[in-house]
A protein has these predicted regions:
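Phosphate-end processing signature that detects enzymes handling 5′-triphosphorylated RNA
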Residues: 1-236
Length: 236
């Protein structure tokens, strides 16, 4: 699991790679990047939305400002497993994230069943405000994927992730039900994301140019909704 950070801001850019681009890039990253200590991990999320899917639709419209609320775990959780309640906002290309950690069962009861958590931090209050603002957020989708994370050997603020086997379901969204779902991308495709506190190093921009890897506007949740989720069933 990645180190826990309650508040941060950064630039995030996604890239959709085919198998040849992934293999070429992976082969030259080792001198610059090191693997996350956990190696490959499975990340599971519940995304929350209004009954008319307002947040998914706004995300797909590529607005200047957008936000999302999700509950994240590493692997299929049990009630006592650690989980992250995340409020993620993006404004003019900068990502601002607020997140708190609590047992999955407690987080689920809060976000899905409306039971107030023990947590009373400022971040918890911001999340509670968002729940109140939208009024009727429901568990809209479970979305899971397998991730390999790399960290820069020189710049602690630079991170690259590779997500494969992205799958989702609109029913039985409780993550305790497993990490299965319909595939969002082709098996040969990899979603890469570069996360940085500032500009990218020259060696990385040179690699992206050499392998013709270009930025892509891609939201996992919005893409799943737009591709398959025209009749999403909200499940608790």
């Amino acid at each position: 699991m990645a180190d826990y950070t309650g508040i941060f801001e950064r630039v995030e850019q996604k890239y959709l790679l085919d198998s040849l681009q992934f293999e070429a890039l992976w082969a030259v990253l080792e001198p610059y990047m090191r693997p996350d200590e956990y190696g490959r991990s499975t990340i599971c999320n519940i995304y929350f939305d209004t009954p008319n899917h307002l947040l998914a639709r706004l995300s797909g419209e590529k607005p200047v400002y957008k936000e999302k609320l999700r509950l994240r775990t590493y692997g299929v959780p049990k009630a006592e497993s650690p989980s992250f309640v995340e409020l993620k906002k993006k404004y003019q290309g900068i990502v601002y994230k607020r997140r708190i950690v609590m047992p999955y069962g407690e987080a689920y009861d809060w976000l899905v069943n409306g039971k107030a958590p023990k947590e009373n931090s400022q971040i918890a209050k911001e999340i509670a405000w968002s729940l109140h603002y939208y009024g009727d957020l429901k568990s809209a989708m479970a979305l899971c994927y397998d991730r390999v994370a790399l960290y820069s050997r020189e710049d602690s603020g630079l991170r690259i992730t590779f997500d494969t086997n992205i799958r989702f379901r609109e029913e039985n969204t409780d993550l305790r039900q497993g990490d299965d779902g319909r595939l969002l991308l082709e098996p040969s495709e990899t979603l890469m994301e570069i996360k940085a506190g500032g500009g990218l190093p020259t060696w990385l921009t040179d690699m992206l140019s050499r392998f013709r890897i270009y930025p892509a506007s891609f939201s996992k949740y919005a893409s799943a909704y737009n591709t398959h989720g025209t009749h999403i069933v909200h499940a608790s």
